[in-house]
Amino acid sequence: MHTPKHAIRRMSKGEMEFFEGRCQRMGEAERTVWGTKWCGSGNEATSGIDLGYFKNLDSCCRTHDHCDNIPAGETKYGLTNEGIYTMMNCKCESVFKQCLKDVTGVFEGPAAAAVRKIYFDLYGNGCYSVQCPAGGRSARTGGCPNGVATYTGETGYGAWLLNKANG
């Protein structure tokens, strides 16, 4: 295919970075729930305190996004995430579910209920629990540097089908 010369324009590195960033942000915005900046597979927030129109719902998603997790294909706590989605700590999932249940409002309440239904019932990737071996806690911090994780298994139909198809 031949591109006419009048359709080609050189651009500076700064212009190119601007357009690349804009395209990236547009792609991320399309993957977030309307009225939020944190709910979805990406985020469009400009900072950690930037929330969308549904502030309470968005706050739940922001907290969840920063929670303990194992990205797809990575290993942590001796557990390898062989799925195609990020696996979350079960404590985080429990807090997220309750946070979504606590969101009220004429529009925001039903939006939070929809996010909860899609995330836990359809997506439902499962989660992992971390146990600390006897005597494994740090006396100084109380942390468990050698924790061992166990996976709960998928809880939603969508994750089960996708992981089976790709595994």
Swiss-Prot record:
One of its GO terms (cellular component) is extracellular region. One of its GO terms (biological process) is arachidonate secretion. Its cofactor is Ca(2+). It comes from the Eukaryota. Gene3D superfamilies: Phospholipase A2 domain. Ca(2+) binds at residues 38, 40, 42, 65. Belongs to the phospholipase A2 family. Group III subfamily. This is Phospholipase A2 heteromtoxin. It comes from Heterometrus laoticus. The lineage of its organism: Eukaryota, Metazoa, Ecdysozoa, Arthropoda, Chelicerata.
